Amino acid sequence: MARPDKAAAVAELTDQFRSSNAAVLTEYRGLTVAQLKELRRSLGENAQYAVVKNTLTKIAANEAGIDTLDDLFSGPTAVAFVTGDPVESAKGLRDFAKDNPNLIIKGGVLDGKALSADEIKKLADLESREVLLSKLAGAFKGKQTQAAQVFQALPSKFVRTAEALRAKKEEQGGAGTPAPAEAAE
């Protein structure tokens, strides 16, 4: 590869590292072209899977401020640059690796923090951001409904209690007090 081509490749990889919120490094030794196409499809729209040169990618990662991946650049390496939900991409990689043991997850980076292969697999076990947000919204809605019911119940309970006390006093007032004595003649 000519020097200007290398500089352009490093610049492109640097932009990909900077624009993605996660990058997962994998070893793809033994995968066919058809399997790589299938992997790219399984990652979806929010991830780009690229076979890369280790030296150029290492330089690009360092230029992007990511120096925690240096040990992972050995052997045939490909990077999944994730711009959307990292959980979905991690699930796609994990599931593909289960079906295709030649794909090995080496590690990665999420929002500037280095992740081991095990941490990426744990990330894949999480529910997606949308599911977690909907559960959170449901929990808030349930608490709001409970609070509304409590606030509605308090005035009606007060009215019923006051009505019961009034009825009790009327009963006691009518039966419990002596009748006025008739005037003695």
From Swiss-Prot:
Keywords: Ribonucleoprotein, Ribosomal protein, RNA-binding, rRNA-binding
GO CC terms of this entry: large ribosomal subunit
GO molecular function terms attached to this record: large ribosomal subunit rRNA binding; structural constituent of ribosome
Pfam families listed in its UniProt record: Ribosomal_L10
Annotated spans, Disordered: 165-185
GO annotation, biological process: translation
Subunit relationships: Part of the ribosomal stalk of the 50S ribosomal subunit. The N-terminus interacts with L11 and the large rRNA to form the base of the stalk. The C-terminus forms an elongated spine to which L12 dimers bind in a sequential fashion forming a multimeric L10(L12)X complex.
Protein family membership: Belongs to the universal ribosomal protein uL10 family.
Record function comment: Forms part of the ribosomal stalk, playing a central role in the interaction of the ribosome with GTP-bound translation factors.
Protein's recorded name: Large ribosomal subunit protein uL10
Organism, scientific name: Streptomyces griseus subsp. griseus (strain JCM 4626 / CBS 651.72 / NBRC 13350 / KCC S-0626 / ISP 5235)
